[in-house]
Amino acid sequence: MGIYCNFSRCVAAERLLKRITKETVMEALEAILTRRCVRSFDPARIPSEDLVEKIAEAGTFAPSGMGRQAGLIIKLYNREYRDRFAALNAQIMGREDDPFYGAPLLFIVFADKRQATYLYDGALVMGNMMLAAHALGLGSCWVHRAREIFASDEGKKFMQDNGIEDFYEGIGFLALGYLAGEPRQATPRKAGFIREVR
């Protein structure tokens, strides 16, 4: 059986394994089991750039088909863009309230549609960032309709103005911020969620 990593990668993997303890494993599982979508943010509390960068970095380490890293993460601080995307999103939904739930900051995840697994790759980027946000004490919510918005003339102009190539497709918006109020309880898991074949 061959070893499919060069020396530096093997050393890095060995060091990582030494840092993994029972406590860190339990913390990771706890983050997965206690994360909730947040639909009420405190708009006055803006996450620090350090926290935002850690969350974005977690997204870059999401699995991807053949390791091709199809995802692209945009950290959106611009309030004018944020509010315009909120208006477009609400229009598509046929609603008038803020689809970003008052979140002061957005991530936008795109993925390279030339890659066969781009939808899955983009979804995994979103998932990694949601877990990282929760682990760092922040709330997040995946908001859909990025595909529709960035297929529109206005969305295409945003992409062009900000150097985002046209082979990228919108996967999702990630509303990010501090919770306003208490986190909600998890909905009970559905019966038959897990099945077994032997």
Which positions does each model-derived feature cover?
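Acidic, surface-exposed loops and disordered segments
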Residues: 3-10, 20-198
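Leucine-biased recognition of intrinsically disordered, low-complexity hydrophobic segments
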Residues: 16-17
